[in-house]
Amino acid sequence: MTKRIALLTAAAFSALALAATVSVPASAESGKMMKSSGDTVMVGGAPMYPSKTIVENAAKSKDHTTLVAAVKAAGLVKTLDGKGPFTVFAPTNMAFDKLPAGTVETLIKPENKAQLTKILTYHVVPGKLEAADLTDGKKLKTVEGETLTVKRMGDQVTLIDAKGGSSTVTIPNVNQSNGVIHVIDTVLMPS
């Protein structure tokens, strides 16, 4: 009996220690995150290390395989691996799945590289903007050249694109060595 209690106590402390090192959403609806020491955040089942670049971290996320494939197809790896700083609004695989059937397959074809590049660079803003910098009504000029509009209600940040579509930040402030990623739930579209 004493061994069983000792074993259960040890297991409980191990679980608490593990929980203290992993970031998990405090609320999927609010987008709030609990951060661990060092600001390492879990995204797509992988730790996002602040010492790594945007590309290095995104490549480890199971939730961003479509985005990484698109960045490669557009020839943007070297740019997003560069010094920056950049703020990247990173759509998940599920965000890409919301697009009409065949859209991603069409965009990653070599003959559509210019359109793909336009869409991807519309998700990038020069400089490092934390969630606290994304104030209601703020206009963000993207690398693509058009703007995104921030809508904010409490801690929830939503971006409005050039076509009037909206995308919610689900995981904010994923710090990188060359900027910050904010995970979003819908692909943003330029005009």
Question: What is the meaning of each model-derived region?
Answer:
Residues 1-13:
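Bacterial N-terminal signal peptides that target proteins for export
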Residues 2-5, 27-191:
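Mature, structured domains of secreted/extracytosolic soluble proteins
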Residues 14-15, 29:
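Short N-terminal signal/transit or membrane-insertion segments
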Residues 16-25:
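C-terminal segment of classical bacterial N-terminal signal peptides
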